[in-house]
Amino acid sequence: MTTLTPIHVIGGGLAGTEAAWQIAQAGVPVILTEMRPERLSPAHHSEDLAELVCSNSFGAKAGDRAAGLLQTELRQLSSLIITTADRHAVPAGGALAVDRGIFSRSLTEQVASHPLVELRRGEVTEIPREGITVLTTGPLTSPALTEDLQQFTGMEYLSFFDAASPIVVGDSINKEVAFFASRYDKGEAAYLNCPFNREQYFNFWQALCEAEQAPLKDFDRETAKFFEGCLPIEELAQRGEDTMRYGPLKPVGLFDARLGDFRDPANKEKKPYAVVQLRQEDKAGQLWNMVGFQTNLRWGEQGRVFRLIPGLENAEFVRMGVMHRNTFINSPQLLTASLHFGDRQTLFAAGQLVGTEGYAAATAGGWLAGTNAARLALGLPLLTLPATTMMGALFNFISSASPKHFQPMPPNFGILPELPQRIRNKQERYGQYRDRALADLTTWQTSIKSLATCRV
């Protein structure tokens, strides 16, 4: 029997730990390299694999919630991370939360004791040029490896700071208030526009100036010094009442065609005082990005203040605005939905490095990248998951979104294909998404011939 060459997994976070486990479970040797404790990142405190550096929660458990559906899919696929999280869960209401220390130590012991896993400690400074490799180095990738990744991908395809605007579910936008238009009617009506009158704008501006900001970590603050080109919306508001109106909220050339012709002098009083524009985020038009609204407000404050925008009174946010250091690649330009680089099929990537958000999403990426790396080593075709599953939809999104405006995305129902019939009740609709996803995942698992390789 031919001896298989070990697959290299670089980075021992959630994605890397899951990837290494899936590779080993498929019968392929794997070398998992984690730079800690030889080199600590600014956020980590231990040498354990899959250390949870922020919250101890994987999000809601219920299958009719986006994070919960992703967890359920991962359970069905025998994810090591989710199985271990279930085993070491602590009371957290409707969320899956864990005892961080026990959780990470348990994962370290399981992975290190696997006969096909070699756990190495030390910094990797460049991407291996030969063999199959899975990159899972996360948002705090070391400077040396970041530089090599830059050389491989090209500077324009690598981001170092995540300054992203909130994303809103299209169905939650009041279309009786918001209107479709492009400035001066040039091209197609590509934007949804939320118009303010003077009083509404003043109230919004005042609330924005008074809203509480989230404190930046030291390593975030250092990066933010070089990020003047993308100021947070609250910073613009602090510079004066009219600053936003002459910046991202400028109303010039925007008019609701339902009110008549904007060139008609009789309609002068109907012109908006300021306008918030939302740009389509996905091909199906279910997600909308608030243009120019990168922000460092606390999440609760964002919901309170941004719902003062006319048309967004009942807005459902699938992602809040964030500003923090976050090394991630432009996945739509570089990756396939199988999570390998288009220019090099033997190089895979997963986790926050590819632009997914959240613990469950990182785990899901590790599962797919690890499974496909093992299949490549075994001469089997690579897998993509059904687009109707949360996993499939997430990786389809990051590999096919607009490269120009790509920002990290958490799991959410807005990226799933629409249901055959429109269901107005949100809870019922999400339940239908869940049922379809799990049924399609079961069918997909059955259709895969090499069950032992895929661990499904």
From Swiss-Prot:
**Gene3D superfamilies linked:** FAD/NAD(P)-binding domain
- Asked whether the UniProt record includes Cytoplasm among its keywords, one would answer yes
Record keyword Lyase present:
no
Q: Which domain of life is it from?
A: Bacteria
**Which UniProt key words apply to this protein?**
Cytoplasm, FAD, Flavoprotein, Methyltransferase, NAD, NADP, Transferase, tRNA processing
For this record, the Gene Ontology CC terms, alphabetical, are:
cytosol
Q: Name one GO biological process term.
A: tRNA wobble uridine modification
Q: What class of enzyme is it?
A: transferase
Required cofactor(s): FAD
Entry EC no(s)? 2.1.1.74
* GO MF terms, alphabetically ordered: flavin adenine dinucleotide binding; tRNA (uracil(54)-C5)-methyltransferase activity, 5,10-methylenetetrahydrofolate-dependent
Q: Give the catalytic activity.
A: uridine(54) in tRNA + (6R)-5,10-methylene-5,6,7,8-tetrahydrofolate + NADH + H(+) = 5-methyluridine(54) in tRNA + (6S)-5,6,7,8-tetrahydrofolate + NAD(+); uridine(54) in tRNA + (6R)-5,10-methylene-5,6,7,8-tetrahydrofolate + NADPH + H(+) = 5-methyluridine(54) in tRNA + (6S)-5,6,7,8-tetrahydrofolate + NADP(+)
- The entry's FAD-binding residues are 11-16
Compartment list? Cytoplasm
Q: What is stated as this protein's family in its record?
A: Belongs to the MnmG family. TrmFO subfamily.
Function, in words: Catalyzes the folate-dependent formation of 5-methyl-uridine at position 54 (M-5-U54) in all tRNAs.
Spell out the protein name for this chain: Methylenetetrahydrofolate--tRNA-(uracil-5-)-methyltransferase TrmFO
Tell me the organism: Synechocystis sp. (strain ATCC 27184 / PCC 6803 / Kazusa)
* Lineage, highest ranks first: Bacteria, Bacillati, Cyanobacteriota, Cyanophyceae, Synechococcales
What is the name of the gene encoding this protein?
trmFO
